[in-house]
Amino acid sequence: MILGNRIPYEYFATSGKGESEAGSKGLKYETGSYDAALTDAGIENCNVIEYTSVIPTSAKLIPKEEGLKRIRWGEVMECIKAQSNGDKGSFISAAVMTTDVYDHKNKYLGGFALEYSGSGTKEEALKSLATSLKGLIERRGYGLIDNKVEIFKDNKTSKGYILHPGKIFVYDSLHVKKEHGSVFAALCWVSHKFPSSKNSKTRKNK
């Protein structure tokens, strides 16, 4: 049997923030505050790998509590993640927001996640994410959005596509009081599907 590329299936949303006085030269966040943020989010014993921003059509959101219970020590945790780091005295924030996409016949195509990393408030993060969504949709040829994107509402493009941003919105922030601080928001996958390849027959060599 020949299998197609695996498709991310069940996932949960989480966020975390952390601070530390420790930090090696060149990696001042990864060795302390980022690890503290992973612990705050409940995924500190995973090997975290980042995806880009596409959510499969069949992906299923599960409660965070259920997702955390299924984690095994040392497993690969694949995430769509936004992260912000800062030093003592700074304010840092991160956010992830999903967007459902429907075609002109109202067929659900799948979704996208948009990431924000910076020092903005929740409202500023939403504004930035709305701008990012507009560009993402236009680059893919789904049409233009004449007015500003409305979060938590349906938005129709010039080609009839329907976008609904904000079904999932995760935001976290931190006023850094120690030497280093990190904050992140993420969608974390805990299972995958393996579809059969359409071209399952192998061609014989001549």
State what each model feature region is:
Residues 1-206:
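Helix-coil modules at protein/domain termini and other flexible surface or pore-lining loops
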